Amino acid sequence: MTYTLTAFERSPDRGRGLARDMRVRWAMEEVGQPYEVRLASFDALKQPSHLARSPFGQIPTLEDGDLVLFESGAIVLHIAQRHSGLLPVDERAMAWMFAAIGTLDPPIMERSMCALLERDQPWYAQRLAMLDRQVDTRLGQLSRWLGDADWLEGAFSAGDLMTVHVLLRLRGSGLLDAHPNLLAYVARGEARSAYQRAFAAQRAVFEAAT
């Protein structure tokens, strides 16, 4: 069965692979699951037809037959549960899926929004420095856990997929530079052929819209 993914018609990240549909694309490429894409404009996200799929009017959503899912973490978990190759053998390793979106992502996203929207504010430098410290604390904790390992819990799993995608938002910030093992970790994720196929697919959508 082919899944249907809802993604941005014109992604605000300008095709850099940071929108959350990228996580879902990557997961489907990892397990070899065919999918179709429904492209949505920002206006379409506000319409009743989309709100019936995603109550918060966001992307991504995924349709698997009669099942409709929203939230990227829930979608990636669904894919991992239904296909071999992404679900961790060790149940504890599943925690990394939720750590990525519940612990790592919030301060990283807050920093990203500050850098994007608050540069002209008088408090910008002080606030950015505070957010940098918060993010670096989490990076230090993650770095110590990873150590010299390739992946967080043995073999590559959905937890690594989610974590790598969250960390990619720090590219260009310099915050990963103090943690060489995390830089290498992200590079390993990007080097996976499934990631590269997913990135190319979302990039093609952006280029077609510009």
Task: For each feature predicted by the language model, list its residue ranges.
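GST-like domain detector, emphasizing the conserved glutathione-binding G-site
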Residues: 1-126
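A generic structural-conservation signal
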Residues: 37, 155, 179, 198-199
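Short, solvent-exposed turn/loop segments enriched in Gly/Ser/Thr/Pro and often Arg
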Residues: 41, 158, 202-203
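Active-site-flanking alpha-helical
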Residues: 80, 166-167, 199
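Residue-level signal for well-ordered alpha-helical positions
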Residues: 82, 111, 173, 201-202
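A short, terminal or domain-edge coil/loop segment
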Residues: 86-96, 141-148, 168, 201-210
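GST-like fold's C-terminal all-alpha helical module
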Residues: 100-191
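Long hydrophobic alpha-helical segments typical of transmembrane helices together
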Residues: 182-210
